[in-house]
């Protein structure tokens, strides 16, 4: 099993890929022996306010996984948020028997939380990340980064 993490922008600039994020992600699995592709998606509203989400593709199932992005994150320091995403996604895959939905949830939550922490090393525990995921999935008025 191989996992490839690459943003849409990086795929276009580095690998000269064309098309939308779904076409690009799928093309990697057609070109290389890759089972999973994850692509983060950050929207910068201002230097200190971002939204963050991702798309996760399972080549064996030929299925894309997405969730509502974390919106209007008050960014303290974004350095390390990509590494935080990868650590969360890998945890979700390994802990939950290669469940792509869980990989997406843990990756997105871990990265979103990291954006609110100074320094390049996230200091969040598993309980905090799981609480963030639960809050993010709840309906109605919520504080997504309620820590």
Feature map (PLM): residue ranges:
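Catalytic metal-binding/acid-base residues of hydrolase active sites
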Residues: 9-11, 43
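A short beta-strand/loop micro-motif in the catalytic core of glycosyltransferases
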Residues: 1-8
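A generic structural signal for short hydrophobic patches within well-formed alpha-helices
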Residues: 11-12, 129
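Alpha-helix N-cap/helix-start capping motif
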Residues: 8-9, 83
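Conserved phosphate-binding/catalytic region of the ribokinase-like
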Residues: 18-147
